[in-house]
Amino acid sequence: MRPVRGIARSRILSCSWRGTWTSALTILYLGVYCESTTVTPTTVEDTTVSNGNHSDASRNNTVIRNLTASVDFSQRKLYPYRICSMSMGTDLVRFARTIQCVPFNPRVNSEEGIMLIYKRNILPYVFTAYTYQKELLFQRSYKYVTYDYLLGYSREFVALPMWEIFLVNSRGQCYTSHQRVIGADRYIAYHNDNEVNETMWLMRDDMGNDDTYRYITVKEHARTPGSVWLYKETCSMNCIVTKTKGKSKFPYDMFVLPSGVIVNISPFYNGSNGKTFREQREKFHIWSNYSILKDFGSRALEARIVPKMAFYEREDVVIGWEVNDQSNVTCEMILWETVDRAIRTEYENAFHYVARTLTSTFVENKYSPDNNLTEDDIKCFKNDAQKKIEEVFLRDYNETYDMDGNATYHVTTGGLVIVWQGLKQKSLKALEIAANESAVSATGSNSRRKRSLPDESTGDISYAQLQFAYDTLRTYINQALGHIAEAWCLDQKRTAEVLHELSKINPSNILSAIFGVPVAARVVGDVISLAKCIEVNQSTVLIKGDMRKFSDDGKLEGCYSRPVVWFSMKNSTEVRLGQLGEDNEILLGTHRMETCQTQDYRIFVAGDIGYEFQQYVFTKKINLSEIDIIDTMIALKTEPLENIDFKVLELYSRDELAQANVFDLESIMREYNYQKKRLDFVVERVINPIPPALKGLDEMMNGMGAIGKGIGEAVGAVGGAIGSFIGALVTFVTNPFGAFVVFLFCVGCITLVITVYRRQRRAMQRPFDYFFPYASQTITSSVADSSIAVAYPGPEGTSGDAPPPYPGEAPYGYKDLSVDADTRVSSSSAGAGADFNEEDAVRMLRAIKRLDDKKRQEIEKSSKDSASNKNSETRRRPGIMDRLRRRGGYQKLNTEDDVHV
């Protein structure tokens, strides 16, 4: 096949000459048309070609007609307008080269009958399974003043306890809490952190497929934000119950779920039947007459009774399934082909079963131990085989044949099981019965009998003649059947060789003739690549009436070897170019050119009409009935035998091979996509913790030798520590809570500085009032058991804040407030005019100390009396000595307090 530019060399699956073509093959051909020139032909039937610059007189004022080529409906079914050009097919086929024909042996016996061929069932056992689990979603967040930050989450799947599974299967509900015991500690998680254990209804999930139904309690996970400047971790709980399909493959020692979960337990294990069990037995439970809901999402609570229900507990899921009897739900063999007419030939060591419709011979070794099939081996398909044999017999053989014995079961060398039901013609069956009865009557009695009549003797001779006739007929029939079978086998072998060689010349025509439909074929090495042709829109095919090609300036460039056609694909209005091929095939492209001949005459067939071209220009239409046919068919006087078409044997179809694997990729990807859609993705940034400066310093130090490397490590360690410390500070400050603490600390420091500054300023301005507040107050003293109230007024018109008078001097304006003038205290007795000595100073300090102790006691007493008042609290006033020793932290005394000396 000639390759065409633009064809994508990709193999497209699921396309064969017998099956349905997928859209992928259409896409393949659309890729071919991408390089085709898209034109819009004129809608008129006749087009006048102008002369232009061409000097050929034959082109002047020539009327060229574009022909609408229609195909008759009878021919359209076999050879419609189609495209068969492709670089690579989708199926690979080859001719059988190892056909073995056993020569006829007159001593072998051949018989005809009905043959059923059973193959091993590779499809897995499919059953309903349930999974029970809870999804715990823990979400950590931080609440700021105006924003709520989601910091992360963790998802965990846990198995439901068995007591809660009973609630799910009976009520369609599950609880909003989950308890886990780790060591001696018990942990309980609640849905939405509400600290209440309630029940939630199951409902159908939106995501699912035909084989998997998922029931959940929560469609969207909720999250409760925390308080301002605090972290909070919330829990959202979702019960997930899945009704899906489990698959187990022969020998049924494990099964697989669509989610990829593998359980190493036979689905038929019931606890005592000896089936495979490779899991923890304490986690396995089985119940009889178990009640389970048909639909967990329905409030109708319609249940069904399961004879045996098994559950297996795992850490993250509980798996349940119905336990059935293996002999009732599975069969190791499955019917492959039914051969209505077959021939079995018996040889010395084997039986050969010839299936004419399959063009195959199946061999059974007589002495192979594998041929001994037990009743248990055929139990699962014995009844079906008997019904099928009776159906074929009543349809095709009831009037002319009888069954020869019962059906027998045989195993071929390829592992197939053949059910053989021998047939015998009714006339031969009657002769055989008569011969057997004659033999029985001849040997049935040894007693002496009365001489028979002459006609009885004649009857004995006729029985012998019948027996001889039967034996002779059987021999001739067996010989005829043997020769026919051998000749038929040799003919098929030679035909296969001839077709194999012819396919190297034109594989498309040979394969089209074999399969009876137009196909595109190409020899690829020692095999043939096969694909089906694509039909175009039959009503849009238009043949160009001119096979000459001119340049833009009107010069003749050459001539097309095949007529140019316009066409459109189905369900498309885009017009494309091609060339007309044999049997209505459209060849893609217009590159098939040749040198123009002067006296050219050609006829091209499209449909049931011939189109005549002279000098590469269409002249007229020709009826094909006017052209004689070369008849190569030699008609037989007898009825011809049925034609035998080659058939590609497929022991297992593509669907069976796809379903044979327990790991269904499509189901696994659906389950994966379901889980993926439910995930919340968090983007993380990866930051290099090493600063670029330290990294450059380390590289520089490494170049200075061992000493530099050591210094670099020390500097790097110190720099790393400093960087970590600074990073910690930056992290603390950038944290909202840390920033608030720093702000409060700064405000406190500023307040403390202002307070200290004001105290120091007041002490500097009035130090005597600050350190000795008692001096500016009214003094009450007791001297010599006499109470004298002394006031120290200042000059007239001034306040009484003046200091006491010096000894020996009468203060101006002072007067005795408690006694008469005669009894006034004389200042001379106190040593008027003399300075205070050290002893006087000591007595004054002692007096101040006694005054300080007295005031302190009064303050303590006053504090105890006012402790009952909750609205005010008076702090203990420090004494004078304390003020002198610790001048900081003084508090100003009240003006109404008295000082007693």
UniProtKB/Swiss-Prot annotation:
Glycosylation sites: N53, N60, N66, N197, N270, N289, N328, N372, N398, N406, N436, N537, N571, N623
Region described as Disordered: 794-813, 852-901
TM region(s), chain numbering: 737-757
InterPro entries named in the record: Glycoprot_B_PH1, Glycoprot_B_PH2, Glycoprot_B_PH2_sf, Glycoprotein_B_ecto_C, Herpes_Glycoprot_B
Keyword Transit peptide applies: no
Compartmental location: Virion membrane; Host cell membrane; Host endosome membrane; Host Golgi apparatus membrane
Membrane-topology descriptor: Single-pass type I membrane protein
Site (Cleavage): R451, S452
Subunit structure: Homotrimer; disulfide-linked. Binds to heparan sulfate proteoglycans. Interacts with gH/gL heterodimer.
Protein name per Swiss-Prot or TrEMBL: Envelope glycoprotein B
Lineage: Viruses, Duplodnaviria, Heunggongvirae, Peploviricota, Herviviricetes
Protein encoded by which gene: gB
